[in-house]
Regions:
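Residues forming the flavin
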Residues: 1-343
Length: 343
């Protein structure tokens, strides 16, 4: 982690890392509550015009069914980018938020052997598992790019809401799976959403995630690239078979994406053939949809790292100020420095 350009822990080892982080927090006097949901904020006027400040928070222990009010004049809100119930609650409480652009698309799967031979040559087995990073600008000006590439990894059913489906990718520490997968995504913004309010992007995600769920009956929709181009449901696999955490079913993946996004993905994958031989093979697998690349909202904050509600410090990926583990950690450090005055 200290010296590698792209350090890799592995999803299988990450759980143990997080456990030891929790133990260190507890050793330092912190408390970690499992299954406790933030329901709402209790806010009061400061008496200075329209200025408001945080007074306490309402939480519920979902295991015990017990509600509690926690006195709190400073709250670091480091939520994830899929905390939709919290986004709704914050919006109802008058916390200033804006819609934010993000990217959606699919996961593609290829043979890891094919990727290795293309990246390293015949001695690929003697070298670390090969990865790649690809970008393309379409004739319409949209950017198509690979995201969160997982060498020797799995495509994961990462659904978090009933009746909706989203996928993600993961690799174990050894990266020894037979397939390579990566998100191939296209940026979408307010001009693509149905509305300009703070939650327009979240509604956009839900719309397409519901289509993904319905398309394959709750299983991960999968389609061969050759059939994606023809706009027909696949009937059988070629040389590449899905390597997933969660069941798959054939569906028309093109129909669970906005038309402009689907067209851009087709153009992008075709263009990537010039960089990786075999990338646009007809039996390349497309699994959908990848819709959680980053937060669909930005919680507005000032130079003190506080929102319009004094004492509320939104930070990290869910707040719209980071796009991954490292940038989220750095934003958390900046927030802590502001609160402590640099101590």
């Amino acid at each position: 982690i200290l010296y590698l350009q792209k350090p890799h822990i592995g999803t299988d080892k990450l759980a143990d890392v997080v456990k030891h982080m929790r133990l260190e927090i507890e050793r330092l006097g912190g408390e970690v509550r499992f299954g406790v949901r933030l329901d709402s904020l209790n806010i009061k006027n400061t008496g200075n015009g329209d200025s408001k400040k945080l007074e306490s928070i309402n939480v519920t222990d979902r295991f015990l069914g017990k509600a509690e009010v926690i006195e709190c004049d400073r709250l670091i809100l480091a939520i994830g980018h899929s905390a939709r119930d919290t986004f709704l609650s914050l919006n109802e409480s008058g916390v200033m938020m804006q819609p934010k652009s993000f990217a959606i698309g699919v996961r593609v799967e290829h043979s890891q052997e094919m990727i290795g031979r293309n990246q390293y040559g015949e001695l690929y087995k003697a070298l670390p598992t090969a990865d790649y990073k690809l970008t393309h600008q379409t004739k319409d000006g949209r950017g198509v790019y690979s995201f969160c590439m997982c060498p020797g990894g799995y495509v994961v059913n990462a659904s978090s809401e009933k009746g909706m489906l989203a996928v993600n990718g993961m690799s174990d520490y050894l990266r020894d799976g037979i397939n390579a997968n990566s998100a191939i995504v296209v940026t979408v913004g307010v001009e693509d959403f149905d509305g300009t309010d703070a939650l327009a992007g979240m509604r956009f995600q839900r719309k397409w995630e519901k289509k993904a769920f319905d398309a394959a009956g709750g299983k991960i929709p999968v389609q061969l690239f050759g059939d994606f181009k023809k706009n027909v449901v696949s009937k059988e696999f070629g040389n590449v078979r899905p390597q997933t955490k969660g069941e798959t079913a054939f569906a028309n993946v093109r129909e669970i994406l906005p038309g402009e996004v689907a067209d851009s993905i087709e153009e992008g994958i075709t263009a990537f053939e010039k960089k990786i031989n075999g990338y646009s093979r007809d039996d390349t697998l497309l699994l959908g949809i990848e819709s959680r690349t980053s937060s669909p909202v930005k919680i507005v904050r000032d130079d003190t790292m506080q929102s319009n509600i004094k004492g509320l410090y939104p930070c990290g990926e869910g707040a719209g100020y980071a796009g991954g583990i490292t940038s989220a950690a750095m934003d958390g450090i900046k927030t802590a420095i502001k609160i402590t005055g640099g101590k």
